[in-house]
Amino acid sequence: MNSLRMLRPAAIRVALASRARMAQSAVVLKPSLNSTTRIITRPLSIKSLFASKGDNDQSTSIKQPILSQDNLFHPLSESPIPEIRDRATIIKKYGTCPVCNEEHHGDRASMHSPEFECPDCGHPTHCCEEHYHKGKAEHDKICGILREHNEDEHDLRSGRPMKEFEFPSAQGFDEAINMANWDVFFYTRSFPSMDSDRNMRHVSKLLTYPITIGSVLHESSPYKKQVTPEGLRSLAAIRSILYPKVILAKDGVTMLKTETVNLYLLGARAESTLPPHIWLQLSHLFPQTPFHLHFIGPDTLPPNREPYTTFLNDRLTFTYDNAMYHDYHEKIGSFDPYRDIYFLFAPGIGHPDSREAWKPSIAKALDTKCAMFITGFDQTDVQTDVKAVEEDHGEDFDWILKPTENHFKSLKHDINLQDLTQAICANWGIWGIRGKRYEVTHNQEDD
């Protein structure tokens, strides 16, 4: 499993070809300081579910739901949704029975596929009913999460009106935004009422990327205790651009725009598949500032797709490029710590298969002296990446944000279809660094 973080299985891509392209992340079941991180792939489809509706889609709003809210649980292989039945096929083809795995010490030749579906969660979990009962005590630790995931996926495709995705537009001039947590953010941004935990899970999974960025940069950031003195200096510089003095145009009404802030999203995967209009929720937090988002990394675009730049409006520009960052870096030229910021979402810097590949990119980013914020999918993942950066670049950076749990992590679990015992919530933790600055001192003896 160690090589699966960056792997995109061709068979899975074919089976789910009707969905948006897949993005992977590593996942584990339980955060633990002493456990070994288990690396797996995670399919994530966003565009097909959350793309904005066009004028020709009005008819879909009056269709009767496929599933009612009291009929969301189905065994995967018997689901009325073809895509979910495909998941059962993938699990049976690529998964293994955990009891067989334990009995045969990981010898795949002796293990059987999970054909028996748990009656409580609906997922194929064991090779037979006998092994299901034998391993039920261990399975019960994840069964509730799997059932929740089963119902969430059916709900997304149930055909009901998804009121929770009717996101608010620009914030009123005199209406303050509070970034304490998801609940307070939704309330102060006038989101539709979240009537259930399921609504919260759906929306948080979609918005965890733009709002994680916004929560770090916003003046009401919840990370005041974790920000270091060097971090205060970096954020003060950035916020001097994001929060300028209110200057109006000649018409006396329109606020003048600030300089453009560049966000470099290195190793981009799931975040690069978000429909562009979702990033408006970041833009609305800083109404005077244009953003240019650079999605950079080998998984940003499908193979053989040429890099390109597109615009949503005059305040949101997107560039997509499959280059490694240390190659892309040379295209930029100069950098400004006031206007350039790095974000790395669960990059796997400390993973053995990717550590060497990350070294030159991290070094180039540190050379710019611009702020860099990094997330991880659990505590162990965060600590693994921190350890790798400290060992490889320890003399070259200052801490700006100490590792902490992300207030805007995804509340929805992502499940590894190759090993159902592994699940995570995206962007569980966050930390930040910046290239070390050296103070210039004056030696009076030289006078």
Residue ranges and their predicted role:
Residues 1-60:
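N-terminal mitochondrial targeting presequence
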Residues 40-87:
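N-terminal alpha-helical interaction blocks
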Residues 68-70, 91-94, 137-341, 345-353:
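Positively charged, amphipathic N-terminal segments that serve as targeting/anchoring signals
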Residues 84-93, 108-112:
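Short, flexible, mixed-charge glycine/proline-rich loop motifs
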Residues 97-100, 118:
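Short cysteine-rich clusters marking metal-coordination/redox-active sites
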Residues 107-112, 129-131, 135, 151-154:
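Short Cys/His-rich "knuckle" micro-motifs
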Residues 120-142:
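Cys/His-coordinated zinc-finger cores
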Residues 297, 302-447:
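Domain-level detector for long C-terminal conserved domains
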